[in-house]
Amino acid sequence: MDGFAQDWPNLPRSDNGLHMDQLVGELPTDGGFEPQTRARSNTWPCPRPENFVEPVDELDSTKASNQQLASGDPQQAMQNANAAKKNSSRRNAWGNLSYADLITHAIGSATDKRLTLSQIYEWMVQNVSYFKDKGDSNSSAGWKNSIRHNLSLHNRFMRVQNEGTGKSSWWMLNPEAKPGKSVRRRAASMETSRYEKRRGRAKKRVEALRQGGVVGLNDATPSPSSSVSEGLDHFPESPLHSGGFQLSPDFRQRASSNASSCGRLSPIRALDLEPDWGFSVDYQNTTMTQAQAQQLDQLAGSMAEELKLQSDMLQQQGFSAASGLPTQPPPPYQPPQQPQLPQGYSLNGPGYAAMQPQPQPQGQGQCLLHRSLNCGCLHSAPVRDGLSPNSVTTTMSPAYPNSEPSSDSLNTYSNVLLDGSADNAALLVQHQQQQQQQQQQQRQQLSSGLEGQCLEALNSEQIDEFNLEDFQGGLECNVEELLQQEMRYDGLLDINIPLAAVNTNTNNVILTNNSTNSGSSNAASNSSAGVQLNQLQAQLQLQQQQQQQQQQQQHQQQLLMSNNNNNNNNNNNSNNSLELATQTATANLNARVQYSQPSVVTSPPSWVH
């Protein structure tokens, strides 16, 4: 163990690729142990020397191998390659040559400049010392697989079909291969020449957009913190980022690869997928003249005002656009308390036609539809096409001046008002049906009640101010017609007109004015009207008494007739018994008895006592 205390000699570093087993033999053997061999995998690469300088051009070995393909001595080529790579570590266990370089030397050393795959294997085992002991099947699987991969992936090798049947193909050197570092070929599944072309065009377009976006978009200064490029922060064709919108400097972009930069919020349009609409990139900068803007504003304002005026006018007037009937009810008519006369009675006088409607002065703008001075129709906007309310003739029902106008006049008026809005009529069909139902109900109520018949002959003027005090002279009534109407109902209707009710109700009786003397007093008119009403009531009572008497007489006659019928029945029974008692008599006697039986007896026979 004393030998371990001695200093170990400094072993020289090997730069020419010598094996470590050669260096181990120089170790001192004083320690009493023999040198041990070490596996080849642990012998390389050798450590670099301290004064090692990395060569500038690393392609010298490849260039030398490609330029010396024609030389027939492979050993000289290998020495030249080793000399070019002096003072550098070995790349592989056999030296600085790659598998592609070894295959190139093997094919170039052949006479026909072509070798099969098995011949390349043999050349490797024979000429490269590293593969001499690796020719068996167990240890050659790895490096033979590497040779096959290099043959298929490098452009410098070309496969040629063998003429003989059942033989492997030839491998030759491609004369069109570029000198220098060879480019690896892609597999057949990755042959995407079309994709490469499209990607090249996309790159050019990205560069153009990048330059145009940086220069033209409002001269915006790009953020210095962008990792890919400043121009990609702008999206000139995006509708969300018009005007040169710039992303926040805190936005972290992805790596600057083609896939990643095109995949995130890509401003690049897909090629041949979107139609070209002809819009320029800076279409957002297009402006409109001031005159065009004013015309558009005026057009929009006039349309809005017209629609608003039409809707307001229809709502104020109570019209429905579809039916032309008023949607709001007329002002309610509230007459004083009145009793209703039986249906079918009308008191007519010879002078009722003298009550004519007085013309209204032109200064008062009374609404013809609602008969009101403060109607909302007068405060609305002017009627379309210069139509005035006076030019529309409406026919009111004389029985109720404040009621709704007739359907013909309202349709005429609504058609003129709704000349420009006929398209909106279909939206109000439901309102039309509701108004038609209401109109039918009102007509039925007016026709079924006594007011609808008695008030048809009234004046179309307001009847709120109609009073007995305004009339002078006597009141006349056609009593005969009244009595005839009573007799038509066989006396089943009763007339009961209280005096107080007649004095307060003037809507159910048609009054006439036979005097034009306006200077007479109200007291005289009231007294004369009261006298005539008393006479009318007395006549009606007399008529009722006469009817009662007639009814009593008819009742008595009916009683007499019933008594006579009873007597006749008794006589018939006695005749039948008499006939049964004389059945043994002759046929003539039977005939006499049968002849004595009357079929219809109106009076007792003379022989019955």
UniProtKB/Swiss-Prot annotation:
SUPFAM superfamilies reported for this sequence: Winged helix' DNA-binding domain (SSF46785)
Entry's localization field: Cytoplasm; Nucleus
Function, as annotated: Transcription factor involved in the regulation of the insulin signaling pathway. Consistently activates both the downstream target Thor\d4EBP and the feedback control target InR. Involved in negative regulation of the cell cycle, modulating cell growth and proliferation. In response to cellular stresses, such as nutrient deprivation or increased levels of reactive oxygen species, foxo is activated and inhibits growth through the action of target genes such as Thor.
GO CC, one annotated term: cytoplasm
Gene3D superfamilies linked to this entry: Winged helix-like DNA-binding domain superfamily/Winged helix DNA-binding domain
DNA-binding region: 94-200
Oligomer status and interactors: Interacts with melt.
Pfam families hit by this protein: Forkhead
PANTHER family: FORKHEAD BOX PROTEIN O (PTHR45767:SF2)
Region feature Disordered, mapped onto this chain: 1-89, 181-263, 321-365, 384-411
This protein's encoding gene: foxo
Biased composition regions of type Pro residues, renumbered to the chain: 327-339
Tagged with keyword Nuclease: no
Name of the protein this chain belongs to: Forkhead box protein O
